[in-house]
Amino acid sequence: MAGVIAVMAGLSVRTAPTLVIFDFSTGSGTVTIPASPISAVIEVWGGGGGGGFGLEGVGDNGGGGGGAGGYSKTTIASLTGQGGKTILYTAGVGGTGSNTPDPGNTGGTSSVSSGTYTITPMIAFGGGGGTSDANTIQGQGGTASGGSDTNTTGTGGNFLTRAGAAATAGVAGLQGGAGGDGGLPTIGGDRGEPGLPGRVRFVFTI
């Protein structure tokens, strides 16, 4: 079994490393580094912005799509002797879509910071909300900072197609914090869709 030390003929043989994964899309908390850690990869996505309000006869394009949250990634090459120490995290919420001729709400900020283990703070801001179709502005992508590997600004939403921005793909194509679609240009108006929540993912190799 992976991660288990087998004793055969008086010899200790360690099998392939094991992955311990913590994956959060809501709230704040503490992650404890598992025992006998080797290394870690940490990814942070900000929450997606909400879509804008759509109303027929104003711009007839519908509301602007919300922007995607920023993305930050850090690799910790060596965690020897750090088992039991803690790291703090917050996963940002998705922004709500607009139900009035106002922009959708900005997505929440996601972050990783030091607990008893010292780490450079990682911050991924949420994407901006799309505007109503009375304006020609889509939600802007959130920025990111602090990652040792990557800090990527999220893609902006689309005004003409109402589409919310796709999230930045992380390791193995995983995502978080896509923007919400803008509302349809209908009589009486159509509410924008909410952005998807941010995400914080820890993958420890032990």
Task: Show the residue positions of the predicted features.
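Enriched but not universal
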Residues: 1-41, 75-76, 196-206
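Surface-exposed loop/edge segments in extracytoplasmic proteins
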Residues: 18-20, 52-55, 118-122
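A residue-level signal for beta-strand positions that form part of recognition/binding surfaces
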Residues: 19-21, 39, 86, 109, ...
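Glycine-rich strand-loop-strand elements at beta-sheet edges
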Residues: 23-28, 44-114, 130-141, 145-150, ...
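Extracellular/periplasmic catalytic domains that process cell-envelope and extracellular macromolecules
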Residues: 34-36, 81, 116
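Acidic, glycine-rich loop-and-strand cores that form catalytic or ligand-binding grooves
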Residues: 113-172
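Outer-membrane beta-barrel transmembrane strand signature
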Residues: 172-181
